[in-house]
UniProtKB/Swiss-Prot annotation:
It comes from the Bacteria. GO terms for molecular function: ATP binding; ATP hydrolysis activity; proton-transporting ATP synthase activity, rotational mechanism. Produces ATP from ADP in the presence of a proton gradient across the membrane. The catalytic sites are hosted primarily by the beta subunits. F-type ATPases have 2 components, CF(1) - the catalytic core - and CF(0) - the membrane proton channel. CF(1) has five subunits: alpha(3), beta(3), gamma(1), delta(1), epsilon(1). CF(0) has four main subunits: a, b, b' and c. This is ATP synthase subunit beta. It comes from Rhodobacter capsulatus (Rhodopseudomonas capsulata). GO terms for cellular component: plasma membrane; plasma membrane-derived chromatophore membrane; proton-transporting ATP synthase complex. Keywords: ATP synthesis, ATP-binding, CF(1), Hydrogen ion transport, Ion transport, Membrane, Nucleotide-binding, Translocase, Transport. It is a peripheral membrane protein.
Length: 472
């Protein structure tokens, strides 16, 4: 028999509920009705005198003292599995895309312990994305966590969509996208772009490759603080049921921290540095430790990270850095050159760019490419002031090769076909290593720079050079 209680106090997103008997456990979901709609409350504190303090997962306008509340007996539970593919859910697992109900045949609680040590897979393996600049210079590891840094309009969303597309094609895996405190318009745009690019199939939803979970900026802090966990729960189910590699996107992980800080203040906890919640590291750890590889499969997470006031020492981004295995930095300067994806080859890093994981050849080629690009960067001031003619012959050669490498790091994407007019390509890792090794060694010095722009492997470069020569 579910315990019954009544609302005794409403302060914004915080609701106090008093029970006659049978106090619900911390993190239990309570249900009440507000304006005829189901409202879920999550227990956060026990106050004594049979009263619990809860966080509301939706707006509390209209909720009154004395309203009846029932305990569900467990944490918030959401539908999971194939029924969620191609759908948009909210924090409590209700569909918000106006396409009917989602089957609750498979359901999971959003609060789960991290897999224990015995279940985790510890070997480092590269997750091949088919995107040259990432695979070569800042490779992603299976079950790793990747931070995606970039301002507005440099291509974060396009890169995220291409990764979803490639994981579906190359690894036939699923993706889960959690929109945490993002703009509703961006969420809507992403949904429609996914339909256009075929990642979501409206005719046959079960053939879609992605499930979406949204808690936008206008939602109360309770929803924004929990929506990342809802998305992660969906990803865990895909990993465990299919044993494949699952991609889990969070946009934006900073909003998760921000919502936690709002909730913390409402609960009356004393804030720590810069006004953040005292439990900042615990909250982040509880989310990040669940993102891991098990012997069944892996969850690889790509997290967009907003850096407040570009201050990397701010506690919110600084806490997330500790968990990251790789960083992909998108640069406005590179996007202005028309080079997409606009990944900065010198700023992006990866823990697994190590000869013992990726192999000696891959490591050496990556370091040679970065060395050449770094030399070009240091020569740019001289070129700007004195011109190319003042450089030594050796430096002229370095600059010529570096410019070819810079263009060769660009690549047409499937999801950006409408902008580029050319079909996207996924480049196998072996081809990427072989191609860049040859370019660094000077085997293609005779080919024009333009032949290296927006192509796949080196064979495409040669074919493009022949087309350019014929056209000339």
């Amino acid at each position: 028999m579910a315990s019954k209680g009544k609302v005794t106090q409403v302060i914004g997103a915080v609701v106090d509920v008093q029970f006659e008997d049978g106090l619900p456990a911390i993190l239990n979901a309570l249900e009440t009705t507000n304006n005829g709609k189901r409202l879920v409350l999550e227990v956060a504190q026990h106050l004594g005198e049979n009263t619990v303090r809860t966080i509301a997962m939706d707006a509390t306008e209209g909720l009154v003292r004395g309203a009846a509340v029932s305990d569900t007996g467990g944490p918030i539970t959401v539908p999971v599995g194939n029924a969620t593919l191609g759908r948009i859910l909210n924090v409590i697992g209700e569909p918000v895309d106006e396409r009917g109900d989602v089957s609750k045949a498979e359901a999971r609680a959003i609060h789960q312990p991290a897999p224990d040590f015995a279940a985790q897979s510890t070997e480092s393996q590269i997750l091949v994305t088919g995107i040259k600049v990432i695979d070569l210079l800042a490779p992603y590891s299976k079950g790793g966590k990747i931070g995606l840094f970039g301002g507005a309009g440099v291509g974060k969303t396009v890169l995220i969509m291409e990764l979803i597309n490639n994981i579906a094609k190359v690894h036939s895996g699923f993706s889960v996208f959690a929109g945490v405190g993002e703009r509703t318009r961006e969420g809507n745009d992403l949904y429609h772009e996914m339909i256009e690019s075929g990642v979501i199939n409206l005719e046959k939803l079960e053939e879609s490759k992605v499930a979406l979970v949204y808690g936008q900026m206008n939602e109360p802090p309770g929803a924004r603080a929990r929506v990342a966990l809802t998305g992660l729960t969906l990803a865990e189910q895909f990993r465990d049921q299919s044993g494949t590699d699952v991609l889990f996107f969070v946009d934006n992980i900073f909003r998760f921290t921000q919502a936690g800080s709002e909730v913390s203040a409402l609960l009356g906890r004393i804030p720590s540095a810069v006004g953040y919640q005292p439990t900042l590291a615990t909250d982040m750890g509880a989310l990040q430790e669940r993102i891991t590889s098990t012997k069944a499969g892996s969850i690889t997470s790509v997290q967009a990270i907003y850096v407040p006031a570009d201050d990397l020492t701010d506690p919110a981004p600084a806490t997330s850095f500790a968990h990251l295995d790789a960083t992909t930095v998108l640069s406005r300067a590179i996007s202005e050159l028309g080079i997409y994806p606009a990944v900065d080859p010198l700023d992006s890093t990866s823990r697994i760019l190590d000869p013992q994981v990726v192999g000696e050849e891959h490591y050496q080629v990556a370091r040679d490419v970065q060395g050449m690009l770094q030399r070009y960067k240091s020569l740019q001031d001289i070129i700007a002031i004195l011109g190319m003619d003042e450089l030594s012959e050796e430096d002229k050669l370095t600059v010529a090769r570096a410019r070819k490498i810079q263009r060769f790091l660009s690549q047409p994407f499937d999801v950006a076909k409408v902008f580029t007019g050319s079909d996207g390509v996924q480049v196998p890792l072996e081809d990427t290593i072989k191609s860049f090794k040859a370019v660094v060694a000077g085997e293609y010095d005779h080919l024009p720079e333009a032949a290296f722009y927006m192509v796949g492997g080196i064979d495409d470069v040669i074919a493009k050079a022949q087309r350019l020569a014929a056209a000339a």
